[in-house]
Amino acid sequence: MKKFTTSLIAFFAVLGFAQANPGDTTWVQANNVRLDYFNNFDTTVTFPDGSVTYRKVLMEFTLGSYACPAGTQYCHQWDYTVLNYVMTPAGDTVELSRLITPFANSGWSRFPNTWKQPYLFDVTDYVSLLKNTASIRIHYSGYSGGFTANIRFAFIEGTPDRNVVGYDKLYEGYFAYGNPADPINNHFPVRNKTAPAGTTSAELKFLVTGHGSDTINQCCEFDNRTYDVLLNNTSVANKAIWRDNCGVNPLYPQGGTWVYDRSNWCPGALVDPIVHKLPGIAAGSSYSINLKFADYTATPSTKGYGGYEAHAAVIYYGPINKTLDASLEDIINPSVYPDHFRENPNSNTPKVKVHNSGSTPITSLQFSYGVKDSAQQQYTWNGTLAPLADAEISFPALSTLTSLSNSGASGTFGFRAKITSVNGQADEDATNDSLSSTFVAAPKWPGDVVLNLRTGNLGANGNLNQNPWHGVWKITDMAGNTVRQRNDASCNATYNDTVAMPAPGFYKITLSTPFCMGFHWWPYDGSSLQPGALIVKDLTGTNLPMKGYTYAGSTLTDRGEHDDFGCEYTQYFYVTSAGTSSIDELATSYGILVYPNPASDQIHISVSGISGKEATVSLVNALGQIVYTRQTREQQILVPTGHLPAGIYSLIYNAGDSRKVEKVVIAK
């Protein structure tokens, strides 16, 4: 056990966590083991003695891999359940956290020999168990090895949101579902409890994941089932045991079926507990509680019934300790933290997560933020944030981030954010007001890019060889205006679209598919479903690298991870000057007439050759700033210009895959 009086910088810097500037922090090293087969891996740990109050206790679980002995099958290649427990000398055994290992196939870009994936859990509610001497158990359910596990804890001194005054474990174990001879609800009987002294509120925390498969519904891993929380024999909640966002998992691509949604888990992701508020419970309250799963009779497979791994407990809280306080919880961007891999590198608009850690609703927050060792900007957010609630807040554009991308800067940089006032005044706890992160800047690209798209044969309606193809790409500016998109591609076709960015600034490429299987997904290699592929190039034909994206070979006969991004992919980039090439290359049979030119109060646009097609009309000044934009299907368009200063402007008319640009003069 080691104690520090500085920030958490050393603790999180290597992995890119947002770093706090808290009170004194005690760090405790726990397990550091190889997970070589199905087993319990126990480590005796000396924790703090409980004489100090902690604002927060964090558990960091770092997953990695090792080289298995020659001839070993499936080394770190399967999605196995990992349960993490604390076991006290008094006999308490409580599950602290849960995660599922990824399909970490060797040779894939996200899984080099040195790969590490951190998982961060807030275990503050269990601080009374994490004291003196206790054991931390990792239960690994794998039938092959190859993974490593490292657990350590950070005890951050200060005042927690609420004190935990008691804890009642209700249920724990793995229970088959759908067996008429042993209904699952037999294992979730009514529990009669009494809230301890000091209780002002109570919550049920339920860690549950479905595994295995029956014959018809693939229950429970791939089947969406529900349960009720019964408090005093009355349902206070009905919840589906389901996670619907596996296709946007930040740890991707993986070598298995990582895109499929599952029963409250995704491969390579931590498992979030399901939390239910229990109304009407206070000190001395006697109550009954149980969980009731929806009735279900399964047809067992050759491996039997599926089931649920469950751990449920009631946690009793005292009152909120602070009156007016906000906590800066996370920096979502800019950041290199792996859990924010899909959002980064981003543009010049930082985003943070804020928590109301007081009892007073928050209506305004003032922030200071900026790149380290540079001028800090100020921003005031106005809204409503209830006690103990969270919010994600985006800041206005930060000029220093623009400068870094404009210069093509490489390497890592530091970013800081700080809450400077809450509801117009200083809050009660300054130790939770600041965070910092490490980040890389968005890349600088040329103003003209070529998108080489080769489509497969899966139509957007799910049928083969029926147009349009299921994949879509879109380029937008930071105001959300569409610069160009290909959303009506034919199956089995090739497109080379040259796109000119209309002005200097940040842009975003978004790739998407309704089936959450990227433009290519390896399970279909060799089948009748043919893959697609996208490569982004400059005008010389040189590939422009996209973060976390593997380009295909020239013939699409290669296998593996190319174009495997799940539901959606984003790439931010910056251009220093507007492009020019697509104006002529994309000309079509339709035309636009712009008059008067010069103009004073308004510009009239007359469109001929097309009818009813949605288009975007933009007006860009000589500095590359978009001063007017609208979407329309009209053929006679009026653009107001009376409020604009005199000068030369570019009028841009985007209609689907085609683009027209006219120079106009505004004279006063």
Feature-to-residue mapping (PLM):
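Residue-level detector of functionally pivotal "anchor" positions at catalytic/ligand-binding pockets or at interdomain
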Residues: 320-344, 442-449, 572-595, 608-610
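Terminal connector regions
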Residues: 401-441
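Intrinsically disordered, low-complexity Pro/Gly/Ser/Thr-rich segments with frequent PxxP/GP/PP motifs
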Residues: 375-408
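C-terminal outer-membrane/trafficking sorting elements
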Residues: 477, 585-595, 599-668
